[in-house]
Regions:
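N-terminal "arm"/small-domain region of PLP-dependent enzymes with the aminotransferase-like
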Residues: 1-27
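Conserved N-terminal alpha-helix of the aminotransferase class I/II PLP-enzyme fold
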Residues: 18-65
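Short, flexible micro-motifs
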Residues: 6-7, 12, 31-35, 42, ...
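Conserved PLP-anchoring active-site segment centered on the Schiff-base-forming lysine
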Residues: 74-88
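Fold-independent oxyanion-binding glycine-rich loops
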Residues: 4-5, 65-66, 88
Length: 88
């Protein structure tokens, strides 16, 4: 079963459908694996650049899930026994 969130009902919007068709023509039906294994696609880098521009910062990094963000960031940020991270 395939599923996705559709909060804004964009899955059937004509512009979204056309962009999906074009992306499928260009990139195929999937990346083949997660970014950590298959590497970054130009779409990843473009999305991160757009987020950075929107936030007015030099760069950004998009994680695919909260868990991967925690695994990637917490060991970098937390160095001492006195540090505490609370994550939902």
């Amino acid at each position: 079963m395939l599923s996705a969130n559709n909060y804004l009902n964009l899955t059937t919007h004509p512009k979204v459908v056309e962009a999906m068709i074009e992306a499928t023509r260009t990139y195929g039906a999937g990346s083949g694996s997660v970014r950590a294994i298959a590497g970054a696609m130009d779409l990843h880098l473009q999305a991160e650049q757009k987020v950075a521009e929107f936030k007015g910062v030099e760069s950004s990094l998009i994680y695919s899930a909260g868990y991967t963000a925690n695994v990637g960031l917490i060991p970098t940020l937390v160095k001492g026994k006195e540090d505490v991270i609370i994550s939902d």
